[in-house]
Amino acid sequence: MNALAPLGMVSDLPSSNQVSDGTAVSKDYFVVKDGVKFAGTHLLVDLWGAHNLCDPDMIDRTLREAAETAGATILHSHFHHFSPNGGVSGVVVLAESHISIHTWPERDFAAVDIFMCGACDPYKSLPVLKAAFRPSSINLGEQRRGLIV
């Protein structure tokens, strides 16, 4: 039995690095950008003065749309709604990595991580987040993960 089955994180579809007979195909998903090779781009997105931070279903839809807009393949998502403040923590697991969020509605703040490898462009997710959460300001950081030196 697959170890992820109890968590509901098993896909019936072969991943993009498998052929239909179950034989793994070796493919390098590292990114080459500006002559530098690395695993993927990890964006750290702080949304201040943000709205819509208490609805896990809306946040799930938003992060799924952000992933699809970036060209990612969604495998699974899970969100938790906290009380009494109504904050939400959740993740959309991608074949190319993940998008996660933690919200603090009492501070009008959300912390979003977008980590993607391969041909996905995590920057394409940002307009989706801006439209859904309407932040008054955004702090954005980028980290190239798995940098080959």
Can you describe what each PLM-predicted range is?
Residues 1-149:
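Polybasic/polar functional segments that serve as interface/processing modules
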